[in-house]
């Protein structure tokens, strides 16, 4: 990420983004410079208008974090059917005590790990 920041600094200072300038900025910041990464970044940014890219990134809409999206109509029916099947299976297994023993046995391994 330091390499991208160095390129942004050069762009902001109206300096050419080339291998020498990028290396100088990274050296000044105390970064252990890898020449291959410098060359790759300079080549990748060759035809990029950084100002335009920054403006587009800043103007991109940020999705609201209101939880998961509601499923589509067809997906909701399938989800309801899956829930009903899971409930039926749980009800059918209600009298089976072997599952409790399996659950306890699997939990013992975790106790040993964190014990």
UniProtKB/Swiss-Prot annotation:
Biased composition (Acidic residues): 74-106
GO molecular function terms listed in the Swiss-Prot or TrEMBL record: structural constituent of ribosome
Domain of life, per lineage: Archaea
InterPro entries: P1/P2_N_sf, Ribosomal_P1/P2, Ribosomal_P1_arc
Region called Disordered, residue ranges: 56-115
Keyword Ribosomal protein attached: yes
GO biological process: one example: translational elongation
Low complexity composition bias: residue spans: 56-73
Keyword Oxidoreductase listed: no
GO cellular component labels: ribonucleoprotein complex; ribosome
Pfam families the UniProt entry points to: Ribosomal_60s
Sorted UniProt keywords: Ribonucleoprotein, Ribosomal protein
Function, as annotated: Forms part of the ribosomal stalk, playing a central role in the interaction of the ribosome with GTP-bound translation factors.
Family per similarity comment: Belongs to the eukaryotic ribosomal protein P1/P2 family.
Name of protein: Large ribosomal subunit protein P1
Annotated source species: Haloarcula marismortui (strain ATCC 43049 / DSM 3752 / JCM 8966 / VKM B-1809) (Halobacterium marismortui)
Lineage: Archaea, Methanobacteriati, Methanobacteriota, Stenosarchaea group, Halobacteria
Primary gene name: rpl12
């Amino acid at each position: 990420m330091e390499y991208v920041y160095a390129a942004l600094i050069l762009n902001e200072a109206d300096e050419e983004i080339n291998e020498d300038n990028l290396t100088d900025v990274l050296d000044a910041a105390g970064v252990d410079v890898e020449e291959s990464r410098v060359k790759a970044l300079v080549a990748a940014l060759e035809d990029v208008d950084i100002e335009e890219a920054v403006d587009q990134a800043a103007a991109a809409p940020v999705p609201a974090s209101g939880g998961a999206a509601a499923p589509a109509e067809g997906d909701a029916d399938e989800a309801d059917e899956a829930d009903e099947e899971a409930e039926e299976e749980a009800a059918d297994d209600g009298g089976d005590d072997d599952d409790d023993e399996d659950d306890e046995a699997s939990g013992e391994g975790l106790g040993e790990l964190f014990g």
